[in-house]
Amino acid sequence: SDNGIARLKAENLWMSLSKRFNLPFQVFRLSGIYSNQFNILKRLKDGEAKIIKKKNHFFSRIHVEDIAEVLFESLKKFPEREIFNISDDRPASSEEVLLYGIELLKVKKPETIEIEDLESEMSKNFYKDSKKVSNKKMKDFFKINLKFPSYIEGLNYINNNSI
């Protein structure tokens, strides 16, 4: 996507600067971030969630507590110049995650919208490409066991502790 190309150019510029001035440099590419305060369960309860129909559209996500753990570990083990994908172990469609949230909360299914009917350009752009990435390098390098290896553990925790 255009946004992805722009991000890659920015990463390359920063990497060049770090080499030029001999500075350590790490890039953390964050997947879709969710937390106890910002998540599909809250959107379902607030009546803001909609099912967006798009076949084979997957993206990776990560709970904010797992992001914090990775960043903490990066302070202890700081490679000279590296790029890491920060994500959980299970890319999933937004529909799959939303349906799991419905099951947890035992609420009615929200309105379904076909991808062609989205009005927001930002939403259309989001659903243009799948965004699933591998977290293998992150897990191997930092020796991390994610607290929330998938949205299932994350949403269960949020449901039991936050809402």
Predicted regions and their residues:
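Active-site Tyr-X1-5-Lys
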Residues: 1-26
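Conserved C-terminal active-site "lid" loop/helix of NAD(P)H-dependent oxidoreductases
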Residues: 99, 118-145
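Amphipathic terminal alpha-helices
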Residues: 149-163
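Mid/C-terminal beta-alpha module of Rossmann-like enzyme folds, strongest
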Residues: 70, 74-123
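Residue-level signal for the nucleotide or nucleotide-sugar donor/cofactor binding architecture
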Residues: 5, 62, 92, 133, ...
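Glycine-rich "substrate-gating" loop/helix at the edge of Rossmann-like oxidoreductase active sites
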Residues: 2-4, 29-33, 54-64
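Glycine/proline-rich active-site loop of Rossmann-fold NAD(P)-dependent oxidoreductases
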Residues: 8, 21-23, 33-47, 65, ...
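A short C-terminal helix-loop "cap" of Rossmann-like NAD(P)-dependent dehydrogenase/epimerase domains
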Residues: 44-54, 105-112
